[in-house]
């Protein structure tokens, strides 16, 4: 008996589209530019498919086409493809420039969020009070002590995947410093989170900390 259980989130739907239309949707690497109006084609092809709703399909398609790897694939000379992988019209210069700008803005939002998080972490660190003049003069006569060994920061607390919930606040390790985020979807293999900038990311459990 065919499985008719509804797909629960965008990741599952994208994986389903990759399986059902492998000549059009790519799971890894640079994605192929999609034909304009491909949502309507998908809606017609999947009209009798009880596993996919139009609302979830639209959300999954939006996530797929706004991903960095999809935007990277929009280059001069590339042709848009339909669901069967047949090439159509070539990308216009306007669409290529729009993709470059969208990719640039998306990366800038992530990096800006990292910088903001770094500043917030530094601001939370307690400051030592300035020494009084008399104390400073007395200390200036003493020999300088050998530099102390650098004390490592306390280790980050990894999340327990079994206890993660939608709308829970976590931090995403994107570089040297974790970035605040809110959980939007929890799947078997990873989590969809929303950064403070509004950007949505799909990350593995090991990249989340409290």
UniProtKB/Swiss-Prot annotation:
Family matches, as HAMAP family: ProQ
Major site of localization recorded for this protein: cytoplasm
Subcellular location: Cytoplasm
SUPFAM superfamilies named in the record: FinO-like
Family: Belongs to the ProQ family.
InterPro entries: ProQ, ProQ/FinO, ProQ/FinO_sf, ProQ_C
Function: RNA chaperone with significant RNA binding, RNA strand exchange and RNA duplexing activities.
Gene Ontology CC annotation, any one: cytosol
Record region (Disordered): 103-148
SMART domains: ProQ
Keyword Cytoplasm tagged: yes
Protein name according to UniProt: RNA chaperone ProQ
Origin organism lineage: Bacteria, Pseudomonadati, Pseudomonadota, Gammaproteobacteria, Aeromonadales
Sequence ranges of Basic and acidic residues compositional bias: 103-124, 132-144
Keyword set, alphabetical order: Chaperone, Cytoplasm, RNA-binding
Gene Ontology molecular-function annotations: RNA strand annealing activity; RNA strand-exchange activity
GO biological process assignments: post-transcriptional regulation of gene expression
Top-level taxon of origin: Bacteria
Name of a matching Pfam family: ProQ_C
């Amino acid at each position: 008996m065919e499985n008719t259980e509804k797909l629960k989130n965008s990741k599952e739907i994208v994986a389903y589209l990759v399986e059902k239309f492998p000549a059009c949707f790519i799971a890894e690497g640079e994605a192929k530019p999609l034909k304009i109006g491909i949502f309507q084609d998908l809606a017609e092809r999947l009209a009798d498919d009880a596993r996919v709703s139009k609302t979830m399909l639209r959300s999954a398609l939006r996530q797929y086409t706004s991903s960095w790897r999809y935007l990277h694939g929009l280059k001069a000379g590339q042709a848009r493809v339909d669901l069967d992988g047949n090439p159509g019209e070539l990308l216009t210069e306007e669409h290529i420039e729009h993709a470059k700008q969208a990719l640039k803005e998306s990366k800038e939002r992530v990096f800006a969020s990292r910088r903001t998080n770094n500043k917030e972490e530094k601001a939370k660190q307690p400051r030592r009070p300035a020494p009084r003049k008399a104390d400073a003069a007395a200390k200036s006569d003493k020999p300088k002590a050998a530099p102390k060994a650098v004390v490592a920061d306390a280790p980050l607390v990894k999340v327990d995947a079994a206890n993660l919930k939608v709308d829970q606040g976590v931090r995403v390790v994107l570089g040297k410093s974790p970035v605040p985020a809110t959980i939007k979807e929890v799947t078997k293999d990873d989590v969809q989170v929303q950064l403070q900038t509004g950007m949505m990311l799909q990350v593995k459990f090991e990249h989340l900390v409290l």
